[in-house]
Amino acid sequence: MECLLVIDSGYSHTTVTPLFNGRPLHRAIRRLDFGGKHLTNLLKEVISVRHFDLHQDTKIVNDIKEDVCFASMDFKGDLERSWKGSKSRQKDKAVKDKDKDMDMIDKLNDGEVRVDYILPDGVHLLRGFSRPHDATVTAAKKRKQTALSSASLHNSEISMTLGNERFSVPEILFSPSDIGSKQPGLPDMILQSLSVLPPLLQATMLSNVLVVGGNAKIPGLPQRVESELRSRIRTEWQVRVKTMENPITSTWLGGARMANKFPSVVREYGVTRAEYLEHGSAWTARRFLNGGSGKGP
């Protein structure tokens, strides 16, 4: 018995598809209408309000998302750590001098969340990059940028400090209600998908979960999915969530291997270019649902 639960989180949406003996169980497929573009757009709004207006710079924001965003394993804890720097700056200087050791610990903990991101200038730096947050350097640069004239500003390094933006943006995959959506989060959607299957299949599917798509590259996302599922299911069930080395191309590679190993299946389910141009994408969907070339629309 071959069971696989595929979570495909791509550009436009996220789908949960249980596979049994290589075939999708259509009645159990679920879709979450959030994908990579929604994360990028949300990050764009947050950065434009807090830092710089990047509404017209989708590519830059997408790079920022790929460079620094992560799925939090402890949302409340990370949220507190992201604010430690701003709180510590409000302390009296004498108290800071007295508690240098504690201040150092705060900085170390804070550095796990906050980073400084250097924006590209389009001339000398074509892609931005991140580095560990340094409050003293950041403050000095802000004073320098304020003193610079608009004519010479482009010659300076432009940076911004990112804190809770790093993990609050990917959080909408787990809590869509944060931005007003009534859809369930990814863990709940997975359980909804499995709820229509027999218990034996549910347990087997949970022990073989595969995350693919561009969002699978978000650090911590597979681990967060596994942690959320463990907290929601029977204690005797095993949960294993894995991802491919390159989750973006893994779907294509799987199709290529299937075409090479099972050419008869490709001939049965494949749609020619002429058929697609004549009937459109609906022909492809019905071909798969009806089980082959002899049972088209």
Predicted regions: what they are:
Residues M1-P297:
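C-terminal region/appendage detector
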